Amino acid sequence: MKIPNIGNVMNKFEILGVVGEGAYGVVLKCRHKETHEIVAIKKFKDSEENEEVKETTLRELKMLRTLKQENIVELKEAFRRRGKLYLVFEYVEKNMLELLEEMPNGVPPEKVKSYIYQLIKAIHWCHKNDIVHRDIKPENLLISHNDVLKLCDFGFARNLSEGNNANYTEYVATRWYRSPELLLGAPYGKSVDMWSVGCILGELSDGQPLFPGESEIDQLFTIQKVLGPLPSEQMKLFYSNPRFHGLRFPAVNHPQSLERRYLGILNSVLLDLMKNLLKLDPADRYLTEQCLNHPTFQTQRLLDRSPSRSAKRKPYHVESSTLSNRNQAGKSTALQSHHRSNSKDIQNLSVGLPRADEGLPANESFLNGNLAGASLSPLHTKTYQASSQPGSTSKDLTNNNIPHLLSPKEAKSKTEFDFNIDPKPSEGPGTKYLKSNSRSQQNRHSFMESSQSKAGTLQPNEKQSRHSYIDTIPQSSRSPSYRTKAKSHGALSDSKSVSNLSEARAQIAEPSTSRYFPSSCLDLNSPTSPTPTRHSDTRTLLSPSGRNNRNEGTLDSRRTTTRHSKTMEELKLPEHMDSSHSHSLSAPHESFSYGLGYTSPFSSQQRPHRHSMYVTRDKVRAKGLDGSLSIGQGMAARANSLQLLSPQPGEQLPPEMTVARSSVKETSREGTSSFHTRQKSEGGVYHDPHSDDGTAPKENRHLYNDPVPRRVGSFYRVPSPRPDNSFHENNVSTRVSSLPSESSSGTNHSKRQPAFDPWKSPENISHSEQLKEKEKQGFFRSMKKKKKKSQTVPNSDSPDLLTLQKSIHSASTPSSRPKEWRPEKISDLQTQSQPLKSLRKLLHLSSASNHPASSDPRFQPLTAQQTKNSFSEIRIHPLSQASGGSSNIRQEPAPKGRPALQLPGQMDPGWHVSSVTRSATEGPSYSEQLGAKSGPNGHPYNRTNRSRMPNLNDLKETAL
């Protein structure tokens, strides 16, 4: 492994720009001055002086020399200059992070499958060679112009020769894509890479990161919010890990579930693959061989046969001599090598084109296993070639990239695989394709080599091939490698055994959760409403950041908002998932227990931007964030619940909370059916609620009529009554003052409680924490005063809270009023958050003389207003009671007719002031109260006022 120490090598290249920077150096885009080939040169800093950097760079160099495969970035050469190591790679146009930024709502399903299939093939090749990547994430997945995916950055890769479950370094893998065993410091193996694949599958599908935790413990909490509790073995590891000393394990009783999260986004087959990739117990997690033979990849396996051959060559494109069999390939490698930037695939032996045509038979030579074998053998070591020659060679080389194994050891392993495959391939007609056929061949029906693939593939593959094209999976992952993988899988699977139970639990809870906790699925937003449209619309609409962005009208602005919203979103998300579930179910405490103010007990409420770890992604991600968070995929939902539960994220959180709550109320009040409809249309539905602005009165009536608790999911979704489809934006109203204003306008009705938050959202956003505290205190006092004054006033206080709680608890409540109110408020606040303040002040003045006083410290004015305007406020509250159906006690004081009579704006003013103050102060307290409350409609409001959650407690007491 000698690295030439050539001082003038860099003189051969013209530097075109900087592709990226990392901890170990910089990546430059360069053009070879003679061949004009575009390459990426990774320049390590201080390779000689820094032992850690040196070890990492040499490890990466060794791995890359060993791993030659079509879906692994090609190392062209390595050299030293002035004590620094330079690695010359093929240039690939972009990475998946940038792709997700371009497509914030996710990638089309067929492309998702294609990318995941290629990624699994690359990982399969790594695992076949006992290498675990350990840092699989979107920015380490390069995507060429013709959609060929290449795995790069092996700086954290590790050789598992010591054993699959050796206890390696814990701090590897970007947090969001880190498996539970890595987070807990448990022994791990190849299954850690499979977990990352599952996370990326979800992210590609809806544009949002699946588990965006902001710390190790928050990551565990975020994972459990979706997948359910960890196995008991992992729980023990948590308590025995000194890193988590003194922390309570972040248990979640009502997980969202992958089904609900990706309802209407992923089909059942792909969802099954994802669930098996995201098994909490690594022993139960699918490994590459099982994935490649999964029914969802039938088409890919079939296409892979011919393209995989081309792909094989591509891996060998290094020498394109192999491809020289197709002289065009050899020539194009030389000529197109400069075009690499344009088409790396082509460069790679100009197999790029055939490869691009993976779906196609690819090269004629590839179509004939013979050509593939011949072309492949020249490219790589003959040892490798020989092993692949047996019949599956060509396919193995092409599909399995066996020829990529330049090292004799790799050739050996490849040979072994080939042999394994060969015997089976002999079964199939085209032994030469065996390896590549292992997948493609596995489908005897699908391609000429399907029988081979069947023979060359693992038994499961064969079975699958019989049934479908599943067997084709092995194409790029050689069937032998699959077999080998199977062996390694066995070793890996030995490590854990509890995940099944936990998963079963999670799944069981998930269905119910979907029903009862759409809010947690907010994102998903409610399995009931999920629709394909929701997937696309929701992404843009649902993400809180997305909404805010919409308000701002830019992805960039979104990005800024994304940070805020992200923080809020994150807060929201975990809580959203958890609290919403807990709200709708009987376990509000759990969500509260962790998220009173946090998305999770461990969240700082400032979730990293979509990819905080990626500078580039963060910027672009703003879009993605919108989409991802907005989808209600859990991020937005989480953020919403958190915001509702706590004002911790500072200024933004309270408004967000308010908005989310108001939307919840609105949604629940609007009418279950209408809510479901909206949820289903996710984007369009929310548009409807937005368009419903004028229908607030009706919705108020609906609220009366529909005391049934709305789904939490719907409650979270409703926050986006805007036509923008920025449902999450409303939830994330804190991000954009306009959102809060929207909420406020929506909250003009008594149910619109969040409106107050939006009011103060402009102010509170700037200094929401202070306002919150003041408002909380003032509101608390006002609540007490109201209680003392008369039950009517307390009733007015509690209706908001109750309504909110009701809406939250009654995710399925079919009261449409909240939505309607919200649209009005939204229309008002959307236009002007600040003006809304003044307007509201005016409205409050008209409805309650004291309301205007509470413009800034809404809560304090509310206090006065509530006490002074107990009648008007009470009236409003009765309305809200009737509408909410949760404040039945209050409803006594105010007839239901009153809501109909009252204008949404009028009712909201007095009602809103108190409710807003509550929502702002209650954000967190609300969640607590929800947890404390026993029922959505008939909660005992006996709780004493809490300084932290004065609004909710006061409301409860007043209701009592």
UniProtKB/Swiss-Prot annotation:
Catalytic activity entry: L-seryl-[protein] + ATP = O-phospho-L-seryl-[protein] + ADP + H(+); L-threonyl-[protein] + ATP = O-phospho-L-threonyl-[protein] + ADP + H(+)
Pfam family, one: Pkinase
Region of interest: Disordered: 300-349, 382-566, 646-834, 848-960
Protein name as annotated: Cyclin-dependent kinase-like 5
Organism: Homo sapiens (Human)
Tissue specificity note: Expressed in brain, lung, kidney, prostate, ovary, placenta, pancreas and testis.
Xref: CDD domains: STKc_CDKL5
Cell compartments where the protein resides: Nucleus; Cytoplasm, Cytoskeleton, Cilium basal body; Cytoplasm, Cytoskeleton, Microtubule organizing center, Centrosome
PANTHER family reported for this sequence: CELL DIVISION PROTEIN KINASE, CYCLIN-DEPENDENT KINASE-LIKE 5
Keyword Phosphoprotein (UniProt): yes
Enzyme class: transferase
Active site positions, chain numbering: D135 (proton acceptor)
Domain named Protein kinase: residues: 13-297
Role, per record: Mediates phosphorylation of MECP2. May regulate ciliogenesis.
PTM summary: Autophosphorylated.
GO cellular component: a single term: ciliary tip
Composition-biased stretches (Basic and acidic residues): 407-417, 549-559, 679-704, 769-778, 817-827
SMART domains in UniProt: S_TKc
Sites bearing Phosphoserine, chain numbering: S407, S479, S720, S761
Residues binding ATP: V19, G20, E21, G22, A23, Y24, G25, V26, V27, K42
Protein family: Belongs to the protein kinase superfamily. CMGC Ser/Thr protein kinase family. CDC2/CDKX subfamily.
GO terms for MF: ATP binding; cyclin-dependent protein serine/threonine kinase activity; kinase activity; protein kinase activity; protein serine kinase activity; protein serine/threonine kinase activity; small GTPase binding
Clinical condition linked: Chromosomal aberrations involving CDKL5 are found in patients manifesting early-onset seizures and spams and psychomotor impairment. Translocation t(X;6)(p22.3;q14); translocation t(X;7)(p22.3;p15). Developmental and epileptic encephalopathy 2: A severe form of epilepsy characterized by seizures or spasms beginning in infancy. Patients with epileptic encephalopathy early infantile type 2 manifest features resembling Rett syndrome such as microcephaly, lack of speech development, stereotypic hand movements. However, DEE2 and Rett syndrome are considered two distinct entities.
